[in-house]
From Swiss-Prot:
The keyword NAD does not apply. One of its GO terms (biological process) is translation. The keyword Ribonucleoprotein applies. The lineage of its organism: Bacteria, Pseudomonadati, Chlamydiota, Chlamydiia, Chlamydiales. Keywords: Ribonucleoprotein, Ribosomal protein. GO terms for molecular function: structural constituent of ribosome. This is Small ribosomal subunit protein bS16.
């Protein structure tokens, strides 16, 4: 069961508000969700409220942010977003290091085979 943190449309005609929810990838946009993580109202002054500790928890459990939800989290909970980006950079560095080591082993094997 893949999970995403995404925006769920609410409200009425010409006054849409959104809920930031954790939902299964296969559930419809306005369908069933697992947990409410915040809301966003583009029409009011104080236009969002987020549960940053729950967002952080679910991101650590493997949930993914959609593009628009990521922008909202970046604005509303910059600490959570910064930590998420730091983890991504660290993962990329590990992959890069493994790839570099593999290429070095491969080059050594080729050099050894050419020397024979």
């Amino acid at each position: 069961m893949a999970l995403k943190i995404r925006l769920r449309q609410q409200g009425r005609k010409n006054h849409v508000v959104y809920r930031l929810v954790l939902a299964d990838v296969e559930s419809p946009r306005d369908g069933k969700y697992i947990e409410l993580l915040g809301w966003y109202d583009p029409h009011s002054e104080q236009n969002y409220q987020l549960k940053s500790e729950r967002i952080f928890y679910w991101l650590n459990q493997g949930a993914e942010l959609t593009e628009k939800a990521g922008a909202l989290v970046k604005q509303g909970a910059p600490g959570v977003y910064a930590e998420l980006m730091a983890k991504k950079v660290a993962r990329r560095a590990v992959v890069r290091q493994k790839r570099r080591a593999y290429r070095q082993r491969l080059a050594a094997r080729k050099a050894e085979a050419a020397a024979k």
